[in-house]
């Protein structure tokens, strides 16, 4: 083995499985691994997976030059309310702003509407005497006595973390910084987050909610990242350790510990990146990314080879399909919709006698009934096993055997008998309900973005995604379904395709026809300098750093903005024309027309500073499988249920590793690989393209 050999590892921790991908940078060889997540200590599964993967690949820890990690740990802590006991220091009179929220209701006609409770209870939200004007002028100096008293009260109340969010601190952070110093003096060792660092932009409610969420998960994420870094060091891995951000870039652990709120949805973001890379490689201008794992399902629209981006999202929605029903998090993110629908989603019969699936999940412990680890409640995986879609002896490539009788017993006792159905009917009901739930979520996502999903091929991945993709695609009426090679660990591939990157934002309201170009240039210069410093500390050479500028703009009097590109270089009055044209083009794409004679104003200015995009292909042969067979003959047949066939039928089972470009066959068919299984229903036409992508297209009978 050459001493110059180097490799990279991508690690994606999900609620049920932890996926790893190892890539040899010298030969391009790839190894994929899937391991049960260890909920009590997620780093255990990472450690086990890295050791096993390196052993299988014949590699060594000393060769690993980088590990890129995505996790849903911060997301789960927010949803399950398992973060730190958090206190809030805010401007006098604004103690309840984080609970009042917006005047708008996400459901106008529901008088019993539920809104998510703030992360900080009222008795831990304390006021300090100070006031800043909207332009950054100090109206009332910070009263140190009131500040000391408030910090002391939080200490006595057992606060484990403190959020500081003062009115208009995005324009002048001097009071927040003074409070931060007082916290270090009076509450040493207690983590502190200031809004001027976490989200230095206008909008009080979103800024406060985000700052509270950041410090709420900070102790948990710091402990986790410290522990994982230590374990990787003990394994002898000398390379860099990076964390995926929700925006699709990666950052160092030091940055991630300071702003852990940017890790929320980092795992799903990696899957969207992989789908975007695949769209470019396949020449598909549009894709609907569909990632179904063990706990959740995610849908993301890919346009022109890029995922849609948003500057805000919600967590812990009271109503999963309604905007405004969750906690607002104001950080850059890849825009997607996520619901509790995965292989481990629990099926039950409610008090009305209706079948419900999810959002609760069996996770990895105890897992579905068929895992034989103590689970008694039927899950989607149990239903898929009963229907014949999964091979009990080939789950995870044969490393884990599934108990068919346990699955059948759970479905029969918990669903079939209460509903007066046969076991098969109950299993199909579970399968169909979860498909309808996921399709409905994807449809909502498309409608919110003004997209007609009938024009978007479905790109399916995740451990459970290919099992359900054909039926979900039929519900959505997509033109075709694409399943990549190595679909079960595609999010881990996406981690290896992410550049080092970070976003910066500043608020400064400017009417374009009377803009202070010197101030705007100063803001961009300040953010670009800060961004270059962050990337240089992470080891990125100055010559390969790229910078993207944008501004959030609107017509005067409007309440929300449209983000548009801003040219590089020094801006002046001559820049007004190109910037205005960019805004009008973007506005017209969203609203079909532009108002005449209304001045345009910019509210927020943003900079994204990025390193080079790593080279990796997410399609084509992976070097992680037995040599391809020439024959297209199925490796076996088994009984699988399809309602179109009115029952169980002998269904050919193909070895995914034996399929070659140009192969095609009709459905029904089952295609197996180690980390996932693809199910093609009756009427499907399956073919393999030159990158080994499995493509399912409906015949007329299947439309």
Residue positions per predicted region:
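N-terminal glycine/serine-rich phosphate-binding loop of ATP-dependent small-molecule kinases
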Residues: 1-87, 133, 140-163, 176-181, ...
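Glycine-rich beta-strand-to-loop/alpha-helix junction loops that act as flexible
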Residues: 71, 166-167, 195-197, 246-247, ...
């Amino acid at each position: 083995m050459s001493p110059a050999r180097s490799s990279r590892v991508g690690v994606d921790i999900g609620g049920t499985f932890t996926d790893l991908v190892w890539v040899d940078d010298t030969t391009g060889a790839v190894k994929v691994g899937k391991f049960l997540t260890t909920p009590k200590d997620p780093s255990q599964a990472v450690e086990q997976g890295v050791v096993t993967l390196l052993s299988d690949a014949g590699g060594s820890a000393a060769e690993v030059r980088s590990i890129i990690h995505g996790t849903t740990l911060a997301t789960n802590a927010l949803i399950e309310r398992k973060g730190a006991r958090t206190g809030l220091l805010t401007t006098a009179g604004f103690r309840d702003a984080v609970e009042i929220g917006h005047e708008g209701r996400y459901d106008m006609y529901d008088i019993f509407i539920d809104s998510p409770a703030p992360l900080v209870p009222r008795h831990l939200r304390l006021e300090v005497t100070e006031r800043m004007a909207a332009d950054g002028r100090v109206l009332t100096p910070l009263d140190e006595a009131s500040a000391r008293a408030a910090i002391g009260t939080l200490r006595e109340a057992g606060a484990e973390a403190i959020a500081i969010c003062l009115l208009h601190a995005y324009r002048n952070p001097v009071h927040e910084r003074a409070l931060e110093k007082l916290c270090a003096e009076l509450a040493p060792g207690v983590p502190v987050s200031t809004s001027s660092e976490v989200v230095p932009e206008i909008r009080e409610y979103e800024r406060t909610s985000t700052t509270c969420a950041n410090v709420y998960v900070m102790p948990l994420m710091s402990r986790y990242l410290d522990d994982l870094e230590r374990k990787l060091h003990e394994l002898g891995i000398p390379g860099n350790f990076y964390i995926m951000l929700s925006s699709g870039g990666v950052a160092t652990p030091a940055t991630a510990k300071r702003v852990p709120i940017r890790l929320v949805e980092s795992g799903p973001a990696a899957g969207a990146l992989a789908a975007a890379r695949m769209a470019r490689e396949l020449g598909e201008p549009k894709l609907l990314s569909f990632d179904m794992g063990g706990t959740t399902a995610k849908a993301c629209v890919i346009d022109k080879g890029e995922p849609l981006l948003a500057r805000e999202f919600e967590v812990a929605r009271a109503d999963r399909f309604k905007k405004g029903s969750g906690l607002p998090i104001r950080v850059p993110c890849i825009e997607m919709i996520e619901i509790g629908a995965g292989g481990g989603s629990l099926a039950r019969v409610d008090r009305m006698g209706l079948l419900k699936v999810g959002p609760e999940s069996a996770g990895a412990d105890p897992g579905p009934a068929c895992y034989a680890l103590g689970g008694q409640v039927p899950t989607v995986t149990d239903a898929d096993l009963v229907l014949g879609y999964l091979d009990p002896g080939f789950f995870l490539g044969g490393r884990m055997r599934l108990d068919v009788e346990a699955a059948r017993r759970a479905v029969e006792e918990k669903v079939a008998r209460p509903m007066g159905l046969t076991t098969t009917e109950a299993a199909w009901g579970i399968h169909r309900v979860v498909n309808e739930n996921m399709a409905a979520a994807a449809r909502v996502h498309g409608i919110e973005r003004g997209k007609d999903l009938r024009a978007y091929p479905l790109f399916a991945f995740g451990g459970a995604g290919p099992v359900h993709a054909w039926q979900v695609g039929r519900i959505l009426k997509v033109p075709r379904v694409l399943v990549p090679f190595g679909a079960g660990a595609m999010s881990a591939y996406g981690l290896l395709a992410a550049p080092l990157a970070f976003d910066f934002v500043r608020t400064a309201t400017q009417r374009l026809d009377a803009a202070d170009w010197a101030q705007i240039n100063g803001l961009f210069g300040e953010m670009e300098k800060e961004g270059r410093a962050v990337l240089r500390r992470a080891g990125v050479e100055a010559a390969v750093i790229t910078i993207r500028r944008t501004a959030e703009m609107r017509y005067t009097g409007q309440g929300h903005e449209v983000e548009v590109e801003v040219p590089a270089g020094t801006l002046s009055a001559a820049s007004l024309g190109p910037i205005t044209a960019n805004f009008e083009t973007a506005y017209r794409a969203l609203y079909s027309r532009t108002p005449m004679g209304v001045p345009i104003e910019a509210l927020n200015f943003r900079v994204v500073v990025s390193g080079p995009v790593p080279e990796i292909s997410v399609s084509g042969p992976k070097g992680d499988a037995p040599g391809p067979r020439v024959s297209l003959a199925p490796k076996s047949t088994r009984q699988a249920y399809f309602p179109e066939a009115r029952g169980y039928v002998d269904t050919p089972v193909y070895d995914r590793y034996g399929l070659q470009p140009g192969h095609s066959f009709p459905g029904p068919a089952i295609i197996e690989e180690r980390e996932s299984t693809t199910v093609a229903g009756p009427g499907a036409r399956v073919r393999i393209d030159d990158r080994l992508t499995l493509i399912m297209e409906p015949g007329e009978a299947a439309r």
